[in-house]
Amino acid sequence: YSAIQNHLQANLFPTLAYYKTLRENGINQDEALEYVRKETHKAANIKREEMKKLGNMPFAYTIYRLGVKKHMRKNFPDTGWTTEWVKCNGKEIHFNLHKCIYWELTKMYHCPELCCVYCENDDISFSGLLPKIRFERTGTLANGSPYCDFHFLKAR
């Protein structure tokens, strides 16, 4: 899957390598996570700016809702994620990820604490959809929840 390769090459492995290198060179966990946050937040802020283009369009929520399932299938395929669709209606788009390649690989490489940084980047990226679409989340696999929940709410 090219989508998986893209996640691995563009996001997962470079960040993981940077973090592991910092740790191997004596940087403590909290400090290493801060360095990684600074770097990954740059990409998340670029994504937020891209999201603003959609967020500023008329009927942004409807456009997002009509494309979200196809986007998820293409960019977050079953080989890396297990997606449970809960709602996709005129008020809310809600899905849960029960398996996530980021969580699986950070555990496999003995740095599960790094996964929360990837999750934080969702919050930054999706904030670009405001004010028409509000992103909410109650938990992630990385912070001990049984799944990562994604809620996109249509603004009133």
Describe these PLM feature segments.
Residues 24-28, 128-133, 155-156:
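Secondary-structure boundary elements
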Residues 89, 154-155:
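Short acidic-glycine loop/turn motifs at beta-strand connectors
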Residues 10-110:
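Amphipathic interaction/junction segments at domain boundaries or subunit interfaces
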Residues 84-137, 141-142:
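Short, hydrophobic/π-rich interface segment
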Residues 1-6:
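N-terminal leader/targeting and assembly helices and adjacent pre-domain segments
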Residues 40, 144-146:
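Short secondary-structure boundary/hinge segments and terminal tails
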Residues 147-154:
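C-terminal edge-of-domain segments
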Residues 13, 17, 121, 145:
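Short, well-structured alpha-helical interface segments that form or flank functional binding sites
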